[in-house]
C-alpha cells in the first residue's frame, strides 16, 4: 500500500509522482513496507553482488532511479527476496511419449507454482489416428492440451500474477484445424482449453505452398487469420525467419528454435532436456536524449547477466527448474528491450508513419546492438564463455528482445508500451493493479500550448475512442524540423503525430518492425490492429508482408472491440507480467 509520508524525490522518483505509478508499484512490487527507493536499492545491490562487483550497485541504482533502465516485473518484485525468482517466463518442449507429456506437465506445474508463465511446444505429439505403441491409435494433441489447461488453472502463483500458459503447434500438424478451436466455449467440454493461449508455428515451406495457391495451405492460413481477427490469437512464430537468423553460437551447436514464449518475444532453443528462460528488462526511449551518450546500454547488459546469475543460483536446487537452469547455464541468453518508442516520437514531433521514424529506428537499434555485443564480449573476458558460446567471444547466445511492457510503462513515467503505438490518447483502464484515467503526457503539453487543456476537450477525445482527429482546434498546428510546435505551414501536422494504433497504416508498422528485427537477435512482442470491418484480404496482405520482411513473431491482432479508448489497456494481456520487460 502506498505510504502518504513518502516524499517525492527522496522515497520515490520525481517522475513517478502520478496515480498510475503509485497504484501500480504498490500493487505487489514492494516488500515489507519498503519504499520504491528501497526496492531499487534492493535490486541494484543484489545484482551487483552476483557479479562480484558491489561497486556497480550505485550505478545500477542511478539508472533505475532516473527512469532510464526499467525493470521487468519479476526483477523488481522478487530480486533480493525469498518470495519468488527474478525470472518468471519459461518455454518447455514436449516429446512424443506419455512419459514426457507427464514430465512436462509436472515441470509446468512447478514453474507455475513459483510464478512462471509457460510456453509449451506440443508439435512433436503425434496426431489423432496415428498408431501408438501396442494396440490402438492416438487421440492427438487436443486431450493433452486439456491436461495442461487444467494444470495451469489449478496452480496458484501468488499476488503478482496468475497462472498462464500458451501452446505452440506447427500449422502443418495434422491436428491443427482441431487445435485452433480449443478456446471456443462450445462442443465437448473435454476438448475445450479456455485458459490456454495459442501460437501457430509457420515455416517457409508452408508459406511458399500458400503463395503457390495450395488449397490445404490456404484453408489453414484462412482459419488462422479468421481466429486472429475474432479472438486476437493464435500468435504466430515464423520459424524460417527465426532459424535463418540464429546467432553464431546456435549455428555452431546445431541448435534450432521450435516455439516461442507466452508473449512471443523469446526465440530460444528447447528440447527434451532444455527449457528456455526469459531474462528481461527495458531501456526507456522516452528519456533517450538523456542517456544516448552514456554507458547505459553496456551497463544494462551487465545488469541482466547478473539477474540471470541470481536466477541460476537460486533455482539450481529447486525441483522442476532443472531444464531451465541447464539452458540458462549453457547459453546465458538475455533480452534487453525498450519501451516508450511512441512517446519518444511524439516528444520529437515525429509521426509513426514515415521516413523519420524509420531513420530513428535504425539509429537506436543499431546502437543497442553494438553496445550489447561490446558488453557481452567484456563479460566473456571476465567470467568466461558458457558452453554454447565456446569460441565465439561472447558471454551470451542472445542479447536483445522487446517485451510487451504494459505494466512497466506505467512504472516508467506513464509512457507508451514497448515499440507499440498508443492505443488511445486517453482512456479509462481497469487492471489487476487498479483503475486509472491515463492521458498521453505529450498530448497534454500540446493542449496546454494551444490553450485547450480542458475537461471538455479531453471528454471529446475519450468519446472519440482516444482519437484527436476530431479536435478542430488542432487544425493548422504543426511540428517544425526541430520538434517545436508552430502554426507555420511547413512541418508535420500535430494530428499525424498523435494518430492512435488503429489509425496508423499497419503495413508501415510492419515495415518499421522489419527494420528493427535486423538488429534484434530474439524477437519483439508485435501487435497488429485492424478495424472490425477490415476485409480478409487486408489482414492477409499485412501478415504475408510481415513474413517477407523477416519478422520472427506476431503477438495479438487487435480489432475495434479492443481498441476503444475506454477499454484499450484493459484489453492488454495481464498474463504477460511474466515478461513485462
Task: Enumerate the predicted regions with their spans.
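Active-site cavity-forming subdomains of large catalytic enzyme subunits
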Residues: 2-11, 16, 87-290, 321-325, ...
Amino acid at each position: 500500500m502506498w505510504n502518504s509520508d513518502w516524499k517525492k524525490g527522496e522515497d520515490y522518483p520525481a517522475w513517478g509522482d502520478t496515480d498510475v505509478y503509485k497504484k501500480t508499484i504498490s500493487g505487489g512490487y514492494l516488500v515489507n513496507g519498503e519504499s520504491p527507493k528501497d526496492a531499487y536499492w534492493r535490486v541494484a545491490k543484489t545484482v551487483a553482488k552476483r557479479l562480484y562487483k558491489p561497486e556497480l550497485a550505485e550505478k545500477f541504482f542511478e539508472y533505475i532511479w532516473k527512469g532510464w533502465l526499467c525493470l521487468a516485473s519479476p526483477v523488481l518484485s522478487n530480486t533480493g527476496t525469498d518470495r519468488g525468482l527474478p525470472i518468471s517466463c519459461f518455454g518447455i518442449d514436449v516429446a512424443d511419449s506419455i512419459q514426457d507429456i507427464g514430465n512436462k506437465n509436472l515441470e509446468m506445474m512447478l514453474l507455475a507454482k513459483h510464478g512462471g508463465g509457460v510456453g509449451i511446444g506440443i508439435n512433436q505429439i503425434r496426431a489423432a489416428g496415428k498408431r501408438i505403441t501396442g494396440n490402438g491409435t492416438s487421440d492427438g494433441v487436443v486431450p493433452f492440451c486439456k491436461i495442461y489447461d487444467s494444470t495451469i488453472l489449478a496452480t496458484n502463483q501468488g499476488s503478482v500474477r496468475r497462472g498462464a500458459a500458451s501452446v505452440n503447434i506447427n500449422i502443418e500438424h495434422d491436428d491443427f484445424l482441431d487445435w485452433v478451436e480449443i478456446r471456443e466455449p462450445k462442443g465437448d467440454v473435454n476438448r475445450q482449453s479456455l485458459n490456454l493461449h495459442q501460437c501457430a508455428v509457420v515455416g517457409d515451406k508452408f508459406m511458399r505452398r500458400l503463395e503457390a495457391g495450395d488449397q490445404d495451405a490456404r484453408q489453414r492460413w484462412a482459419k488462422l487469420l479468421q481466429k486472429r481477427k475474432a479472438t486476437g490469437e493464435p500468435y504466430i512464430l515464423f520459424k524460417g525467419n527465426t532459424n535463418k537468423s540464429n546467432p553464431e553460437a546456435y549455428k555452431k551447436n546445431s541448435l534450432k528454435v521450435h516455439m516461442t514464449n507466452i508473449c512471443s518475444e523469446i526465440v530460444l532453443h528447447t528440447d527434451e532436456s532444455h527449457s528456455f528462460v526469459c531474462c528481461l528488462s527495458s531501456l526507456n526511449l522516452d528519456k533517450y536524449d538523456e542517456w544516448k551518450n552514456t554507458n547505459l546500454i553496456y551497463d544494462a547488459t551487465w545488469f541482466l547477466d547478473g539477474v540471470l546469475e541470481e536466477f541460476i543460483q537460486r533455482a539450481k536446487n529447486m525441483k522442476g527448474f532443472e531444464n531451465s537452469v541447464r539452458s540458462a547455464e549453457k547459453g546465458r541468453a538475455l533480452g534487453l528491450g525498450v519501451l516508450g518508442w511512441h512517446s519518444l516520437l511524439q516528444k520529437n514531433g515525429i509521426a509513426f508513419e514515415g521516413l523519420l521514424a524509420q531513420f530513428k529506428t535504425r539509429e537506436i537499434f543499431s546502437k543497442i546492438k553494438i553496445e550489447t555485443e561490446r558488453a557481452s564480449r567484456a563479460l566473456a573476458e571476465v567470467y568466461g564463455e558458457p558452453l554454447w558460446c565456446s569460441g565465439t567471444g561472447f558471454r551470451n547466445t542472445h542479447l536483445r528482445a522487446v517485451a510487451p511492457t504494459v505494466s512497466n510503462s506505467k512504472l516508467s513515467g506513464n509512457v507508451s508500451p514497448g515499440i507499440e503505438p498508443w492505443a488511445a490518447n486517453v482512456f479509462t483502464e481497469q487492471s489487476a493493479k487498479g483503475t486509472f484515467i491515463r492521458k498521453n503526457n505529450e498530448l497534454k503539453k500540446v493542449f496546454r500550448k494551444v490553450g485547450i487543456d480542458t475537461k471538455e476537450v479531453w471528454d471529446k477525445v475519450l468519446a472519440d475512442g482516444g482519437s484527436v482527429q476530431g479536435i478542430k482546434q488542432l487544425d493548422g498546428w504543426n511540428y517544425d524540423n526541430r520538434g517545436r510546435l508552430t502554426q507555420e505551414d511547413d512541418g508535420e501536422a500535430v494530428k499525424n503525430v498523435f494518430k492512435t494504433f488503429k489509425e496508423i497504416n499497419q503495413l508501415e508498422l510492419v515495415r518499421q518492425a522489419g527494420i528493427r528485427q535486423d538488429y534484434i537477435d530474439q524477437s519483439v512482442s508485435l501487435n497488429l490492429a485492424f478495424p472490425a470491418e477490415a476485409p480478409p484480404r487486408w489482414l492477409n496482405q499485412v501478415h504475408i508482408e510481415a513474413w517477407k520482411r523477416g519478422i520472427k513473431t506476431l503477438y495479438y491482432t487487435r480489432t475495434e472491440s479492443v481498441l476503444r479508448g475506454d477499454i484499450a489497456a484493459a484489453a492488454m494481456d495481464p498474463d504477460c507480467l511474466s515478461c513485462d520487460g
